[in-house]
């Protein structure tokens, strides 16, 4: 049995569930339950706070889990788990920020004894120590941005995705501590167990196939047979286009090809110029 730890709420929870669904690992309705079955009787899901998942996986409570890299570092478990996959979403940076009107404009302006408020005391302390700085860390559980304006701290370290929230709260970023994305991690002992490793690899492969497919599109078309060589130049595809005869018209071929989503506009325009017709551009669920 494999226990997969997933965030019970938050901005990455819904996207993760959708990816697992597309991967074929559908989770049964859970209501308020902390556990849920999946379509695979050998895989069960545990719902937990995202910040607790790194420790659960490191300690072997869960075999595999999905959470943010920032939380993995905050729990000091980056060397205690095995990293399997980067989802490349849920992007955020843990940054140091000071009030816009302060004289603190860079890391070089920090002085020993200053106060810094944060929800990430471990990473913040570790980073400051690497800069030979001894600041007093004020641990908060939310609304960190207000700390410098009510005399609690001189500056903050906080997560930001776009920097908009910092600007709205009259704060300026002066340094980046860590860049975070959503990660799939595994317990190291579980990866040594042959049976568990096989099932964990299946989970990894399924998720990877969905993430990869999200960047691709399937193009289908009918095209003049005498334009096949030109088509090959326009759309090399993953393994070259698949070309087959059209029974009703020996002067036309059917062409299928998988291409990068970013190339679709250019490719379709070029295909139209050489006479391609009935062009379909379709999303892909998975690519293995």
Swiss-Prot record:
Any one biological process term the GO annotation gives: L-histidine biosynthetic process
InterPro entries for this protein: ATP-PRT_HisG_long (IPR020621), ATP_PRibTrfase_cat (IPR013820), ATP_PRibTrfase_CS (IPR018198), ATP_PRibTrfase_HisG (IPR001348), HisG_C (IPR013115), N-reg_PII-like_a/b (IPR011322), N-reg_PII/ATP_PRibTrfase_C (IPR015867)
Catalytic activity: 1-(5-phospho-beta-D-ribosyl)-ATP + diphosphate = 5-phospho-alpha-D-ribose 1-diphosphate + ATP
A cellular component term, taken from the record's GO annotations: cytoplasm
EC number: 2.4.2.17
Keywords of this entry: Amino-acid biosynthesis, ATP-binding, Cytoplasm, Glycosyltransferase, Histidine biosynthesis, Magnesium, Metal-binding, Nucleotide-binding, Transferase
Domain of life: Archaea
UniProt similarity note: Belongs to the ATP phosphoribosyltransferase family. Long subfamily.
NCBIfam families in alphabetical order: hisG (TIGR00070), HisG_C-term (TIGR03455)
Function: Catalyzes the condensation of ATP and 5-phosphoribose 1-diphosphate to form N'-(5'-phosphoribosyl)-ATP (PR-ATP). Has a crucial role in the pathway because the rate of histidine biosynthesis seems to be controlled primarily by regulation of HisG enzymatic activity.
Name of this chain's protein: ATP phosphoribosyltransferase
Organism per entry: Methanococcus aeolicus (strain ATCC BAA-1280 / DSM 17508 / OCM 812 / Nankai-3)
High-level lineage: Archaea, Methanobacteriati, Methanobacteriota, Methanomada group, Methanococci
